[in-house]
């Protein structure tokens, strides 16, 4: 006959075991449900139905489709290898061509709900042997009033101290036009000892960024009329460049007002 566990602590130099006292019948507690320990409070309500969740999770949940838009969710990918310099480079993320497919926009207006930046930054074979540290700084910008055939250069938008990209801020006369939505960085190290020749970049941001085009069908910067989405990249080392192999995906919805 098995003994009933007692509420005692058996402590040895190697282990400490706590046993719980149980006054119920041994036949009643033979089949017990497994206990799931949840460390994060938010995850405790993920698999519950909506009517079983607290009021906070029902009132303040973000909608799947942005307001004023309609499905399905469309995807546009930008895949390119860039040479990131100290002076900075720019990529237009909101270039979407007009068409009937799942990678096209239906009309003039659409909303970029989220963006996924995936890839790596890496050093060349000759550069990685030099003893140095290089940081690549990414700026995700909103251009509220696009103008011209191409976006402005890094130095025309940002005000820097001693031409250092890590101190870059939007110029005072351009603050109403350009807005920094997200900023992040990645680091690579060259040299014979603590070499880190490549660094992974993996970022996912929710933006709800509304873009407006003109009557043209081509997805170009010159056809934007409102809210172009730009990605600026610059490295902190003055002489050694960094290569960036990135895949940028935007998830967008067409506007109802088209």
From Swiss-Prot:
Pfam families: Gemini_coat (PF00844). The keyword DNA-binding applies. Transmembrane segments: none annotated. Its main location: virion. A motif (Nuclear export signal) lies at residues 102-123. A motif (Bipartite nuclear localization signal) lies at residues 3-20, 202-249. GO terms for biological process: symbiont entry into host cell; viral penetration into host nucleus. It is found in: Virion; Host nucleus. One of its GO terms (molecular function) is DNA binding. GO terms for cellular component: host cell; host cell nucleus; T=1 icosahedral viral capsid. A motif (Nuclear localization signal) lies at residues 41-55. It comes from the Viruses. Keywords: Capsid protein, DNA-binding, Host nucleus, Host-virus interaction, Metal-binding, T=1 icosahedral capsid protein, Viral penetration into host nucleus, Virion, Virus entry into host cell, Zinc, Zinc-finger. A zinc finger (unnamed) spans 69-86. Belongs to the geminiviridae capsid protein family. Homomultimer. Binds to single-stranded and double-stranded viral DNA. Interacts (via nuclear localization signals) with host importin alpha-1a. Encapsidates the viral DNA into characteristic twinned ('geminate') particles. Binds the genomic viral ssDNA and shuttles it into and out of the cell nucleus. The CP of bipartite geminiviruses is not required for cell-to-cell or systemic movement. This is Capsid protein. The lineage of its organism: Viruses, Monodnaviria, Shotokuvirae, Cressdnaviricota, Repensiviricetes.
């Amino acid at each position: 006959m098995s003994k009933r566990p007692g509420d005692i602590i058996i402590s040895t130099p190697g282990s400490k075991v706590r046993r719980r006292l149980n006054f119920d019948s041994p036949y009643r507690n033979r089949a017990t449900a497994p206990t799931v320990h949840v460390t994060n409070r938010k995850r405790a309500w993920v698999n519950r139905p909506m009517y079983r969740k607290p009021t906070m999770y029902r009132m303040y949940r973000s909608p799947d489709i942005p307001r004023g838009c309609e499905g399905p969710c469309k995807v546009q990918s930008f895949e390119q290898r860039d040479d990131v310099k100290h002076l900075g480079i720019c990529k237009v993320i909101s270039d979407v061509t007009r068409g009937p497919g799942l990678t096209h926009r239906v009309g003039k207006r659409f909303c970029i709900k989220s963006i996924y930046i995936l890839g790596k930054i890496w050093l060349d074979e000759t550069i990685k042997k030099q003893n140095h540290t290089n940081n690549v700084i990414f700026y995700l910008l909103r251009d509220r009033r696009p103008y011209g055939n191409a976006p402005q250069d890094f130095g025309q938008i940002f005000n820097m101290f001693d031409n250092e990209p890590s101190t870059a801020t939007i110029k005072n006369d351009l603050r109403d036009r350009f807005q920094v939505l997200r900023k992040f960085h990645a680091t690579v190290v060259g040299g014979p000892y603590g070499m880190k020749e490549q660094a992974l970049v993996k970022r996912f941001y929710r933006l709800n960024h509304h873009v407006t085009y003109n009557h043209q069908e081509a997805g170009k910067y010159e056809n934007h009329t409102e809210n172009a989405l730009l990605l600026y990249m610059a490295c902190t080392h003055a002489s050694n460049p960094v290569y960036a192999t990135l895949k940028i995906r935007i998830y967008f919805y067409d506007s109802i007002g088209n």
